[in-house]
Curated annotation (Swiss-Prot):
Name of the gene: der
Quaternary assembly: Associates with the 50S ribosomal subunit.
Residues that hold GTP 1 according to the record: 9-16, 56-60, 119-122
GO molecular function, one term: GTP binding
Segment forming the signal sequence: none
Protein name per UniProt: GTPase Der
Biological role stated in the UniProt entry: GTPase that plays an essential role in the late steps of ribosome biogenesis.
Organism, scientific name: Chelativorans sp. (strain BNC1)
Domain called KH-like: residue spans: 375-459
Amino acid sequence: MPFKVAIVGRPNVGKSTLFNRLVGRRIALVDDTPGVTRDRRVHSARLLDLRFDVIDTAGLEEAAAPTLAGRMRAQTETAIDEADLVLFMIDARAGLMPDDRAFAEVVRRKGKPVVLVANKTDVRGTDAGVLEAFALGLGDPVAVSAEHGQGMVELRDAIAEFAGQAEEEERVTEEETVLIGEDIDPDSEEARYDPTKPIRIAVVGRPNVGKSTLINALIGEERLLTGPEAGITRDSISVDWHWRGREIKLFDTAGMRRKARVQEKLEKLSVGESLRAIRFAEVVIIVFDATMPFEKQDLQIADLIVREGRAPVIAFNKWDLIENRQEKLAELREKTDRLLPQARGLRSVPISAETGRGLDQLLEAAVSTHVVWNRRVPTGPLNRWLEAASTQHPPPAVSGRRLKVKYMTQVKTRPPGFVLSCSRPEAMPQSYIRYLVNGLRESFDIFGVPIRISLRASENPYAGKARKRT
């Protein structure tokens, strides 16, 4: 039996939009009017490498049993009973409502595993709604935008904990794969980069490296409190801004220290806010102090950003204090590639937030990295490259049998993610995966962002069949 996931919540929080997103096409009717969905609807769904059945439900409402609303509620409760996992959805834009609290209790009484989903986080002013969701006692909320596909990787990870599925078991094709991080376009098979959409940029770094000074310099006003004392910024502050006609949402964050040094309760909350800002962001500018770069905490922050799948850019701040600048920049960029190989080619820009030096170049790097982060490689060129790469450097033999690579497809962007069909994926050495990742970077210009490759076993069409005699 397929793993079943029910999407529930009060009316008009975006359940049907998420249903359509998971199914991969517009099946459920979506409208701003509450109560559009009346019956529960079941369909097979795919989220990256996870396959399951998803159930769309009517909005939970208080109503007498004989009424239409009461019968709709009964359908929803039946869906919860049938499901293996409940996605309890709230509207982060509207904030927590009394009905959310009441229906959270209904779901809790059912005793089913629950993932709390905070929807509509792609608009300004939703951070408070996400934080309010903790009060429901259903665990940490997963922030998503069902309409725009944001947060789908995090949702996949949350579902996978309960589904027990980590590897894709069937052939994934571009036509079947749910669109991640891009709008569903019913008229187009190929998602394209949209330069009119806002870019969410978080500015992170150790305490007192100049994050708030940098944002003030970028927007040209004293919007954020700055000073020589470490830790002035206590929470994640967002600033809406335009640069060369492009809408940008900037997040300043609290300085991120090593865990052992995070003692004060308020500072722990501040670091938690910084982590959430990273997850909300698309591009993350990591501010290094150029006078003492590559501290252990700098590298830990950079590694976290890459693991979260964000698009990193390094700003070497306080460049006005550096002597022998050309030699120093070459040295820092060489160190960047050596110490952060998981995002080889990462863009780094020398700046001075105090004097304004290098700020345009920093924003140019952020926008170009965002384009690469959204890059999609067509299947034809991808597999021609794979054939050439595996011919030039075949996979090794393991236990006397040579491994074979068969086919590759890109299953997501933001960051680029690929599935490689091969024989015996469990035996494929990491060194060969790194070879393929480096080849993808070189051949398709995917420098400076994480690249993820998942392996799946290729199908043997003769498996289980008796060999025919000639």
